[in-house]
Amino acid sequence: MSEPRRPAAFRIEPAPSPSPEATREDVRKPRAIRVDEAVKITPAEIDIFDSLETEASAPPPAAAPKRRSRLGAVFVAALGMLVSLAAGLWADSLIRDLFSRADWLGWLGAALVAVAALALFAIVVREAIAVARLASVERMRRRSDDAYERDDARQARAVIADLSSLLASHPDTAAGRRQLEQLEGDVIDGRDLLRIAEKELLAPLDKRAQKLVLDAAKRVSVVTAVSPRALMDVGYVIFEAVRLLRRLSELYCGRPGFFGFLRLSRNVLAHLAVTGSMAMGDTIVQQIVGHGIAARLSARLGEGVVNGMMTARIGMAAISAIRPLSFRAVERPGIGDFLKALTQFAAKTDGKRT
């Protein structure tokens, strides 16, 4: 058995501290560098704030329809030339027959043909001017949309100049045109220029257009309530819609003419198809029933209110299709703006009848 170990003392030496020369880092000497070469900022492909703003914004407008085939236009042009040749041959034969009977009858027939030809030429020129004016308004709307998207002040000023010349005959826009002339050098933003022009030039016309739409809707509601046949209702609704389109066109861009009116009607129908007029009709009925309006009105006046609201819907589509600038600074009229006034008018009419 081993002997127990005796206690002993040991000396522990502290660890050596590092020298200041070893711990000191090498200090880099100052030097000049180029920021564009040394620093390169790469933006993120997707910005979360941009995506949130895009989701919250209004839906984009519908894309322009593709151009259709020109076969229909070629057919109409060829048919028109054939009709013109036939009319010319008929007029020549008629004048020859009149000269064979008496000279004065021949000269009278020739004079009447000349007057008819001049009148036809004047009508064609007027229709061409009306169609060109309507096409210029559509181009103006596209140019304003492009200038607003790119914030192009130069193009915005050109659009505003064309708009001022288009609306020069309207006394309601005189104050707005003077205001734009005073602010011509003060505003440098293209978007601000277009917003100011919309408020100063188109806002007074928008109020008149809404009054035209409301008056047409009131007339349709009254005629629907008193007409004995449904066919008369449909006929009057079509008549009122045609007259409303023509008046709105005269308000914004002048008299459309026959062919210009056909083109305008096609644009309005396309706008109604894009926005869903049938769904809007269901919404109108739901609003009328939901507000208890159907219970306060008679059956015929209830039908009149529905037809009047559909007429107002056509008027709203026409305003959007005819207006030279898109709705941005001015609030777009909604179906609710006409519902209250029309139902109050129908209730007052129903009270007078009872």
UniProtKB/Swiss-Prot annotation:
InterPro entries assigned: DUF697, UPF0283
Species assigned in the record: Chelativorans sp. (strain BNC1)
Region (Disordered): 1-28
Key word Manganese present: no
Localization per record: Cell inner membrane
Principal location listed in the UniProt entry: membrane
Membrane topology: Multi-pass membrane protein
A GO cellular component annotation in the UniProt record: plasma membrane
Transmembrane spans: 71-91, 105-125
Family: Belongs to the UPF0283 family.
Pfam family name, one: DUF697
Keyword Cell inner membrane: yes
HAMAP family on file: UPF0283
Name of the protein this chain belongs to: UPF0283 membrane protein Meso_1416
Domain of life: Bacteria
